[in-house]
């Protein structure tokens, strides 16, 4: 853990916003061509079900996920999945604080940002109108489609939560169901509080699904226990549609202990 000090910005308007897009930056060492329309449609359809390509040109490709319908007061329409053309990746905006919380890629993160000069951006649109569980599974399926479409990519960066993964870790995982979103779309951050023995752990990424993120303020405990607890609680909240109400208890971090929420 770095001893570098960071000051919390309580007025951050640039961080993840509730219901914001699930934005994936696919990173490359060399430029890549966009796969042809037929290939993209077939691969995305294999992962998410019935798909219609409504846009394909030199700038982007757009796909309607016809089995995932976003409903609004004035109508309904399929969720849209967008894939942009390959463009330069300048690595801007990844400050020391963001880098410090990339726990899944600690040994490779600096090399990735140094060597990767190109990116493809993929994102969803209108998915915020879906139920949380459906939204999570759709985003996870869309990620797996991108991993198949771009076999030469080096890494994936998930803007909604600040996680960075080597491409091989995305392709080789054995996780199923909505826990795929927890793995790639939710980050658990860790902080030491200056001048005290207190520690703080929080989650980032649940708000993408309009679900609550978590925060733990503690001391005299192994932070790894708390990290695991946070991931387990996040998974439970997603799988069961946020069933925990204010004042209720959940299993605590320590054995035979309950925590009030």
Residue positions per predicted region:
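Short, compositionally biased low-complexity segments
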Residues: 14-17, 109-119, 198-209
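Structural alpha-beta junctions
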Residues: 45-56, 141-156, 236-245
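Internal, hydrophobic cores of structured domains that mediate oligomerization or house catalytic pockets
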Residues: 84-187
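N-terminal low-complexity, intrinsically disordered segments
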Residues: 32-111
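Conserved aromatic-histidine-acidic binding/catalytic patches
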Residues: 28, 32, 127-135, 218-225
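Active-site-proximal structural scaffolding
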Residues: 17, 136-139, 226
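Aromatic/basic-lined ligand-recognition segments
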Residues: 159-261
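N-terminal alpha-helical "arm" segments
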Residues: 1-47
